[in-house]
């Protein structure tokens, strides 16, 4: 692990010479915590401190995805919930919003963020475990690394680095450790919809997980991201979302059509960057929710616009991860869109970033035409049957319990043949839950240090309990933080 830049930090949470010069006010915008963490996409991309140090946008995007993959691997090996992994990723995104990649090793900072996230989410892991596993992942191509980190001198050096890094991260974040994720609003909304709940929740969940690799959490509020994930998941599964009654479905999220369109487009961009040609005649064999590839994009509009909503069909294929192909979006009825209940398309940001122009939504993907929700249902049924007598003893559950149970265990779809797996090796890891984590060890040698192969890694779905999160932003011992900072600079 490399060193950490500390000279640009201040105890107010503002980096000297940072483009984000607004004083850090935890209670900006009517007392809403964390309001200062939202910026427009243009601000994030053009004012990055990394850009000033010679790191272009493409390189920075690669580094962002790299530490996200590293954190996913680290979190699974530490056996922490997906919510903890997501919190660590958000901490990392926020850190590099105010610090440069050129002056801070991404994997060292990521390790610190995982250690910190474990405590924030009340799923702490021993510092020793975090250090050992992180070191092994970083030096996975070095057979001697496992034994080297067990040497007292090497271990103490890494321990000191992580503890130093923790102070730097806390100072850079302004001791604001409060993070909210899209998972809760996503599940609550789907419970209200009562349409294909299990499959829709799982696919949308996968979109949220993959969206962590982008800067969406720095632009949009959690419920806006949840709306975008449900929008894409419904298109992938060809599920009709509620469009009658007092509200159309997207109004449940207090999101405008412009915000919904922008979130959806940015999620799709993630898959376009891993574009590969879809395999011929594999429509039925590779169905599922999966992060794979996007072929092309055409134009369209989000719900509530004057034109017909998008029908993203050229988006991904196989594996249960997150990027599904989309077809047959059932949008709100025109009369609903023109009624007084329609959300006006204004430029109000509401704490999110909206650009005047942005990529349009996509349409028709040949590889996804044969995908339907029956395949997903069949996969669920197959998994239940595979559990044998144990499954037969499970009591009948209500819809809410079933959704949460399915999200915990994931939806296992039909496996691809080796050829298809190979063609998708460069895409984002599978997003389904894996209970035993043993597959994590099977990393391919051609992946970048700290990154995973699609065939060897899967996501864990967050645990949907009602555990009350501690409000970590209060009383974080500011005096100690200032004292530590002075020691670092002395």
Curated annotation (Swiss-Prot):
The keyword Cell division applies. GO terms for biological process: cell division; positive regulation of DNA-templated transcription, elongation; positive regulation of transcription by RNA polymerase II. GO terms for cellular component: cyclin/CDK positive transcription elongation factor complex; nucleus. Gene3D superfamilies: Cyclin-like. The keyword Isomerase does not apply. InterPro entries: Cyclin-like_dom (IPR013763), Cyclin-like_sf (IPR036915), Cyclin/Ssn8 (IPR043198), Cyclin_N (IPR006671). It holds the Pfam family Cyclin_N. Residues 275-391, 414-490 are annotated as: Disordered. Keywords: Cell cycle, Cell division, Cyclin. GO terms for molecular function: cyclin-dependent protein serine/threonine kinase activator activity. Residues 282-298, 352-365 have a biased composition (Polar residues). Residues 367-391, 457-490 have a biased composition (Basic and acidic residues). Belongs to the cyclin family. Cyclin T subfamily. This is Cyclin-T1-3. It comes from Oryza sativa subsp. japonica (Rice). The lineage of its organism: Eukaryota, Viridiplantae, Streptophyta, Embryophyta, Tracheophyta.
